[in-house]
């Protein structure tokens, strides 16, 4: 490859935010494509046709002069639930999509149109098999993301669910076996990548998920945050606890609800220790299958009047909640790499999170927040009491969190690291005479 020519990268994914709606993988791919294009990289985007109304963000990507779009239909099955959410779909339609999308990447590689393939999850299954059968030597980078198909971690692990996901596991492992480099999004995730994908640690490279600080800052509207409080009946003096995420069981929102109930009323039934504990509200941003159960739970626990469920919001409204929050809590039972936590830190919010997935790589206890054992109501309640009682310290913690993001988790930093990984793989292939 000519060192002076731009890199030509195929990005293969089942979804991205601007085309298919929000989600952790979707948002990551969206940011990745935008920052690759901004770096001068030529991108071949292989994914599903757009399912959203065309907007300025979508047009900016699809109409970019350095991007070619290769839509691959996602053939799901009537009556089997929403696309990409049921176990049956994930283990049939998704690998089939990955076979077809990967074959498109293989054709582009064989035609000399791309230098490297960067796949997400099982979306490069077809390319992985082609490399093995046809000796295609265009390098493959694989990001397996959260690896929920392997059953998760800790309390959310389900042996039965893992068994049901066996076909998808095999597809992702085939992609990993063919990859030149497997990405772990955090140092803490490396052992899980090695174990789940049955690979060697030497083949794993840490490239963190990142946030776009310019976007966060552009949405940092103090006035809109005040309006959010006013609209939802939250006074400026109330301590606002924020959580953001899909309302799934593995996010641990039920654990947080029970912990807040303990904060609201001491275990002995006596008056809470701190008067501030009487003056808090919990805002939950997101939607999902556990919404009704959570509404019922907070009412049963006696904190329904303190809790606001916003549903899905626009990016501007989500960032407004970050800006006006006093504390961000992410009680997840399993996590790959939490973009919501990074966004909260980018907005200078102190964080309480659980010791799972990549969260310990982000939240420094006593510096930018607190870490607790997943699923422990008592431990979480104790830390919340501690946080509410240290309002002056929270601002210092929030600023420390912002510094951590600027140093390690901003796209300006991460894209340079990723481009270096690409170039190293291409140089290695050229040295071996493979491309």
Where are these regions (language model features)?
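A conserved mid-protein helix/loop that constitutes part of the nucleotide-sugar donor-binding site
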Residues: 27, 239-265, 289-295, 378
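Carbohydrate-associated surface elements
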Residues: 188, 210
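Conserved acidic donor-binding segment of nucleotide-sugar-dependent glycosyltransferases
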Residues: 365-366, 370-377, 386-392
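Aromatic "clamp/platform" in nucleotide-sugar-dependent glycosyltransferases that forms part
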Residues: 333
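A short helix/loop element that forms part of the nucleotide-sugar donor recognition site in Leloir-type
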Residues: 57-58, 217-234, 269
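Short alpha-helical donor nucleotide-sugar binding micro-motif in glycosyltransferases
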Residues: 312-313, 320-325
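Short hydrophobic beta-strand element within catalytic cores of glycosyltransferases
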Residues: 350-353, 363
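Membrane-proximal helix-turn-helix segments that form the acceptor-binding/catalytic region
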Residues: 163-182
């Amino acid at each position: 490859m000519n060192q002076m020519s731009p890199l030509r990268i195929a990005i293969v994914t089942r979804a991205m935010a601007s085309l298919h709606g929000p989600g952790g993988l979707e948002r990551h791919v969206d940011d990745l494509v935008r920052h690759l294009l901004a770096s001068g990289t030529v991108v071949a985007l292989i994914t599903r046709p757009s399912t959203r109304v065309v907007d300025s963000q979508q047009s900016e990507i699809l109409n970019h002069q350095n991007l070619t779009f290769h839509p691959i239909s996602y053939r799901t099955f009537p009556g089997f639930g929403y696309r990409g959410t049921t176990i049956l779909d994930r283990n049939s339609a998704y690998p089939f999509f990955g076979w077809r999308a990967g074959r498109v990447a293989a054709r582009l590689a064989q035609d000399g149109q791309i230098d490297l393939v960067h796949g997400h999850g099982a979306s490069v299954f077809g390319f992985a098999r082609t490399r093995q059968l046809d000796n295609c030597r265009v390098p493959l980078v694989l990001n397996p993301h959260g690896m929920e198909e392997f059953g998760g971690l800790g309390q959310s692990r389900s042996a039965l669910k893992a068994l049901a996901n066996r076909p998808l596991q095999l597809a992702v492992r085939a992609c990993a076996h063919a990859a030149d480099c497997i990405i772990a999004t955090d140092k803490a995730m490396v052992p899980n990548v090695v174990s789940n994908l049955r690979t060697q640690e030497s083949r794993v490279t840490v490239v963190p998920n990142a946030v776009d600080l310019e976007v966060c800052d552009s949405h940092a509207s103090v006035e809109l945050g005040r309006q959010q409080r006013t609209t939802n009946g939250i006074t400026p003096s109330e301590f606002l606890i924020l959580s953001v995420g899909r309302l799934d069981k593995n996010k641990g929102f039920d654990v947080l609800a029970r912990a807040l109930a303990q904060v609201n009323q001491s275990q002995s039934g006596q008056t809470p220790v701190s008067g501030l504990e009487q003056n808090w509200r919990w805002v939950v941003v997101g939607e999902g299958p556990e919404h009704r159960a959570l509404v019922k739970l907070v009412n049963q626990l006696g904190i329904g009047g303190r809790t606001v469920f916003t549903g899905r919001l626009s990016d501007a409204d989500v960032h407004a909640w970050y800006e006006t929050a006093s504390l961000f809590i992410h009680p997840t039972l399993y996590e790959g790499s939490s973009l919501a936590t990074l966004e909260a830190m980018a907005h200078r919010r102190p964080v309480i999170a659980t010791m799972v997935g990549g969260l310990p790589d982000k939240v420094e206890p006593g510096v930018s927040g607190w870490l607790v054992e997943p699923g422990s109501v008592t431990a979480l309640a104790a830390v919340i009491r501690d946080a509410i009682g240290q309002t002056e310290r929270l601002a210092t913690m929030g600023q420390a969190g912002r510094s951590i993001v600027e140093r390690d988790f901003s796209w300006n930093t991460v894209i340079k690291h990723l481009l270096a990984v690409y170039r190293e793989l291409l140089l290695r292939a050229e040295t071996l005479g493979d491309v």
